[in-house]
Amino acid sequence: MDVRRPIREAVNNRRKPKFLSVSFNQDDSCFSVALENGFRIFNTDPLTSKLSKTFKESATNQSRGTGIGYTRMLYRTNYIALVGGGKRPRHALNKLIIWDDLLQKETITLKFMSSIKDVFLSRIHIVVVLENTIEIFQFQTNPQRICPILDIPPNGSVDYVVCSSKHLQSQASQSQSKILEIIAFPSNKCVGQIQVADLSQIKYNSQNPKESALLPTSIIKAHKNPIKLVRLNRQGTMVATCSVQGTLIRIFSTHNGTLIKEFRRGVDKADIYEMSFSPNGSKLAVLSNKQTLHIFQIFETTNTETNTPDHSRANGSSHPLKNYIPKGLWRPKYLDSVWSICNAHLKNPIFDAHRNDNSGDVTHDNEFYKDRCRIGWCQDSNNREQDDSLVLVWQNSGIWEKFVILEKEQQDSSKTHYSLNESLRNEDTKSAGEPTRWELVRESWREL
């Protein structure tokens, strides 16, 4: 007897993507999701629904749908960037709408020659990423382009942050700090290179219009292979890069382009689709198509005298064979690499609940590995130096998950009996020089 599920039945049982896109705001305090009939906004942690906007079909314009394919918030303000998407887009895919939720209307409209891939907002500028270019405008009722169009590789990764120059200066000069707008993107001319620029350094020529203004950029040779992903930290001092190979993650200084850290995700090739710095820049979270979440330690503490990270105290795990294989010409390079301090192989909690149904295991696994999520870090208002919890929001399954980074218990396997006054986790029993070990634990999850 054939007990296999019919192909048509398996196809019909596939879950439709819950969200068309997910994006966090500038400080990860909120995230927005795009839907086939509008968009929603949630508070990141604790998870609460803040806004739900539903668009209805137009009685006068039958060609106008309700789908929103992309959203981007401006901090926690009433301004939200919208791009059409879905089966019946509300707007064209090459049109950017700035929605004012306070006035309940569209306040700014920008049209382009190609589809919009990403949008970044600040109180000063609007940065629009297209298929092969970047266009930058003033944030005003009638937006004006502030510099020439920037060329990037097809579907190149771009990141943009607004920060204060005090993060790049000593305390003696912090009184004269100013606002910086750092943008990073892959070079269109040289493979493996990225360009970093500060929009506040745009130079205008009185004899030329603003569109011909010069934007000074610095070039960083990051990888040999094409750039896959570029991410800036919130302070604008570091930029993380990875190539299409997906084995190495490198972190550079945006100030002088020097290499700060190099981390190894793994040995085999992977598609890294998400990276995110922690609020104070001490850690970097990385996700690939293998659905393994890695946490890399960039530095441990901040030097309070200069307000700069202490990279000398950074730690990370090493390969188990590093201390057993002597250095030589035949020793693989990856043995000397710095690995993540902890990682977790992610699983969809809804699919896990149906593991007893063996007929659906393959379908569930395939759906999960095709799913993509965004990372947002949680920050304790009472202790802003503590970066130990983060949130994942999955696009297709609509799952919200919170993970925490915990120190592993150091147990002496040779000791099985303890006195009444002795704790199982006594810091005094920790061996001198023994590295601290960490683990990622899922604290909670919820279906949105």
Swiss-Prot record:
Example of a GO cellular component annotation carried by this entry: cytoplasm
Coiled-coil ranges (or none): none
WD repeats (start-end): 222-262, 267-306
Pfam name, any one: PROPPIN
Gene Ontology MF, one: phosphatidylinositol-3,5-bisphosphate binding
Subcellular location: Endosome membrane; Prevacuolar compartment membrane
Positions of glycan attachment: 61, 155, 256, 280, 315, 421
Compositionally biased residues, Basic and acidic residues: 424-435
Topology within the bilayer: Peripheral membrane protein
Primary location recorded for the protein, binned into one broad class: membrane
Gene3D superfamilies: YVTN repeat-like/Quinoprotein amine dehydrogenase (2.130.10.10)
Region annotation (Disordered) ranges: 416-435
PTM characteristics: N-glycosylated.
Keywords: Endosome, Glycoprotein, Membrane, Repeat, WD repeat
Domain characteristics, as noted in the entry: Contains a beta-propeller domain involved in specific binding of phosphatidylinositol 3,5-bisphosphate.
PANTHER family from the UniProt entry: WD-REPEAT PROTEIN INTERACTING WITH PHOSPHOINOSIDES WIPI -RELATED (PTHR11227)
UniProt function note: Involved in piecemeal microautophagy of the nucleus (micronucleophagy).
Similarity comment: family membership: Belongs to the WD repeat PROPPIN family.
Entry protein name: SVP1-like protein 2
Lineage of the species this protein comes from: Eukaryota, Fungi, Dikarya, Ascomycota, Saccharomycotina
